[in-house]
Amino acid sequence: MAALPEPVMQGSADTAAPLTPPNGRPYQPVVTLNGWTTPWRMNAGVKEFHLVAEPVVREVAPGFFVNMWGYNGQSPGPTIEVVEGDKVRIFVTNRLPESTTIHWHGQRLPNGMDGVGGLNQPHIPPGKTFVYEFEARRPGTFMYHPHSDEMVQMAMGMMGLWITHPKTAHPLIDKVQRDYAFLLSAYAVEPGTMTPRINEMTDFNIWTFNSRAFPAISPLVARQGDKVRIRVGNLTMTNHPIHIHGHEFEVTGTDGGPIPKSARWPEVTTDVAVGQMRQVEFMADEPGDWAFHCHKSHHTMGAMG
């Protein structure tokens, strides 16, 4: 096997600038809220990525640090951006104290690449590297997470976003001036501690956008008149009614792909269920500082928005 691509690590919880594609087919990059997009290496026409599963420390709010598990130095891990039809190869190195896998949530791919440990692939032991390889078949917003000791590993923050851009102009995917993406995640961290309770299923006390809590969440910035797209994935254990102030949006995409325009309608709140992705779009035509948050009050206070 050729030498692995060097893993690119990230130490900051700030929102990184969008990654302009240095090679391969062009696309309009997204901005991952309080996150970043990982670079790739081109190898004989294949986009190669290297994810490292490892313990990390995430600054959830200024001065509030939490022991998590993630990828490439952060939780959530880096966003992966590709173009429809790209052949991709992802090297996954395990630096955790237990076995892991990665499931490419929502993707169409060969069964042996689906990442369910003990079903269609062996678990990746500590210190070992597994290689996933498949074609990005359809455009959309997807997620990745372990299917190995899920209760522990997802409670510790192991998750990330995957975005497949359309290869050509798509009749259901409009051009936008602002394109944001983030994951909903939740943790149970007792006062005076730094490590989440991994067996918690209901009583979470830290509700976050991309593992950041208000007021540490970066703003979604737009100029008046911009068309804005926001992609929201939910890997918590409960639904989240995501609500915008001062504007109406349309839900334009789901995990299954773009929604026909005849099936869209304006609203100000959309429920994002467990394991779902929702893509909303709106015109930023009202100037001001507007709230965007989960409308479950204890989540808003927790502080998810």
Each model region followed by its residue ranges:
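Copper-binding active sites and cupredoxin-like electron-transfer domains
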Residues: M1-G305
